[in-house]
Amino acid sequence: MKKIIAILMALVLTAGFAACGNTATKTEDNAGSASDSDVLKVGMECNYAPYNWSQADDSNGAVPIKNVDNMYTNGYDVQVALKIAEALGKKLEIYSYEWDSLIPGVQSGKLDMIIAGMSPTAERKEKIDFSNNYFTSNLVIVKKAENLKDVKTIADLDGKKIAAQSGTFHLTALSEQTKAAANEMSDFTTMLIALKAGTIEGYVAEEPTAMA
């Protein structure tokens, strides 16, 4: 059973949805891209509860995942996307992307925006535009009940095998604020499997995700 250490990182993670607004002019190469139609194309992982997840039916207002057959997505990010599409008078299409492919998806014009709990870091702001933050959350460590019993402060994480998702603010915070033996992993499913297998002692997550 997973437990949460709610001490990690003396910071608040700010998350906002991103939209690409860096291209001021249109060319023949990007004509007919997502933003040129009456469809709003939104990218997310569809694997980051409670913000977004995948399910097999359309219960509770779930939306079809356009690029995954017979699967739907729901969650806070999905409901935000629906409201934005409604306000713009557009039909919503949600696409499931790996985390590292989300920003390139916007840059290439395949996506209109990302709604995926993405933090507006300086590096990302050089590539895409961000809205105002729509959510803030604390970072915590998810662990098994028998792990990390001696951890009371950030300093106690020294040498511990802690994972964080690659390409995220979580990994940066773990590396900069602790001397833990940081493990970089591709997604939260992989980290949870590693935790259950004993490969790692814990992983970094936002508090709502850790509790989901």
Walk through the language-model features, giving the residues of each:
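Extracytoplasmic small-molecule ligand-binding "clamshell" domains
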Residues: 29-32, 37-118
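Acidic, polar ligand-binding/catalytic clefts
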Residues: 86, 91-156
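Alpha-to-beta junction loops
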Residues: 89-91, 107-116, 160-161, 196-209
